Amino acid sequence: MSSSTVWILISILLATVGAVVGFFVRKSIAEAKINGAANEAKRILDEANRDAEALKKEALLEAKDEIHTLRTEAELEIRDRRSELQKQENRLMQKEENLDRKDETLDNRERQLEKKEESLVAKQQQIEELESKVGELVQKQQTELERISNLTREQAKAIILGKVESEVSHEIAVMVKESEVRAKEEADKKAKEILSLAMQRCAADHVAETTVSVVNLPNDEMKGRIIGREGRNIRTLETLTGIDLIIDDTPEAVILSGFDPIRRETARIALDKLVQDGRIHPARIEEMVEKSRREVDEYIREVGEQTTFEVGVHGLHPDLIKILGRLKYRTSYGQNVLKHSMEVAYLTGLMAAELGEDEKLARRAGLLHDIGKAIDHEVEGSHVEIGVELATKYKEHPVVINSIASHHGDTEPTSIIAVLVAAADALSAARPGARSETLENYIRRLEKLEEISESYEGVEKSFAIQAGREVRILVKPDTIDDLEAHRLARDIRKRIENELDYPGHIKVTVIRETRAVEYAK
């Protein structure tokens, strides 16, 4: 054999021996790992068994503790319940003993009442016997007296009663008269105290109302623009408002004259806006007058709300509040009716409080007592009748309605508050300087002029201007033609002559205006 072959054989032999040796080595290593894993598993199992045993013991201990706790709590609860039951039993026994004692007491009282009843029956019998004996004695004495005096019992009784009546009647009359005098003196004294206290606690200011307003101008050139070409601007403003515009030498001022304060205020606002705007022509004047009317209406509503707030009267109907605000622009003998109504409300409330009456209801009645004056120039009837109608319409309290109806003595007052309203009205009106007779007569004459003019069919509106020396009547052109306009002027003139007393003469002007308006599109 060659040496290479020998080396090959040796290499094969060595590889075989190495493979066998490696096999046994790996086998021993694997067996060692298996034995180690088994030992580890046994160790883990032993630890798990020990832990489980410990947990079991711990759980048993906790269960025993919990059972002991529950048993202790149950015993305590049972002990408490037994104690409560024992207390209830004791209370029941005590109540039973009390009932037994009360029963015994009632029995004793019943026996005592029976004894008293027997005693009363015996006494009643004795009294009846005595009454019978007394009656017999009285009858015998009456018979003896009748025999001696020759008078029957009825005759003697009549004589005695007559003497007693004559003596007592005089004494009663004297006592009644003295009581009446004392009552009147005390009533007068109390009334004076109440009135003086109310007057001292009520402070009201009154400013004499005038029939003119002044609009300031930026310069005298504005007067010519207000007059307009051929006077058309001033005529339009006077026709729409029913107010006289007096443009004289007064520097930078125009005077508005009119008896109706609402119209005068509307004209003042409109003219003031026109002066500020600078555009003064008939169409613009109509627009401003209409806008001013809306502003005045809104201001009137605000005045009514402010008045009710100041006086402390709440719950008035919104329409009644607006009518109340109109009183700011009404006067009675020169006295502002709204201020007068507020003063009457305060006085009535103060006097009602002194007498223990409803102060809020008294103020309400005092505030509304002259509500009819707000529209008496628009609706037929006296301001009392109109006020009653308004209060009834808006479902006011019956005391308020009666106070309105009776404050001038037209009907009888049915409550103390109605009497107080009449007294407060007299106090407010009779105060020196509160009213002016001349101004009131003047305003009534102007109102009568407008009333006569507006009573004819076809008349849309009328305005008394020039201090009552002229009345302008606006008629409906579709109802009154030109010939009827002349006839209407004559009829109104005759009625004015027959029904009114006035100095000088009154000019009657009937205005009939027809407008044709078309819009190009």
Curated annotation (Swiss-Prot):
Keywords: Cell membrane, Endonuclease, Hydrolase, Membrane, Nuclease, RNA-binding, Transmembrane, Transmembrane helix. Residues 337-430 form the HD domain. Residues 211-274 form the KH domain. The keyword Ion transport does not apply. SMART domains: HDc, KH. The keyword Nuclease applies. It comes from the Bacteria. GO terms for molecular function: RNA binding; RNA endonuclease activity. GO terms for cellular component: plasma membrane. Belongs to the RNase Y family. The gene is rny. Endoribonuclease that initiates mRNA decay. Residues 87-117 are annotated as: Disordered. One of its GO terms (biological process) is mRNA catabolic process. The chain crosses the membrane at residues 5-25. This is Ribonuclease Y.
